């Protein structure tokens, strides 16, 4: 089981936003700042377990679960396709009428339609493939603020170790901002 990003999002923090936050007026470090923008988004996604910005993902499973399919990186906005390899080794597409997307819960789930069972699959790895779109087109301001704080940290601290200084985490820093949208383990 695993998932991967098929189409990454447009970064919610633009290069102009980051430069303004960093108080940088020249373009000499644009490539580096661009790397930090992506790194900040990915760190926010990892911490919150949510997709930041609209993106297409693919989840692969070795078989259908007994219950619902838990889709990583909510909020899921659409299922593009749900395909599987049947017991004869033939790829099939499950009709949308055979399942429902639950977007109301804290995480997103694909649930079998009432009175149905998941189909049988070939006994092999990655035989169930769910392609879906996740993430809000416009992330909350708290996420953008957390990204800007992270970008600022990376800009000011270009090494993994700082000698001769005391580090203090801001009480209303990145984690406090991201906790407002984080998926907490149940």
Annotate each language-model stretch with its function.
Residues 1-186:
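Divalent metal-cofactor coordination and adjacent catalytic microenvironments
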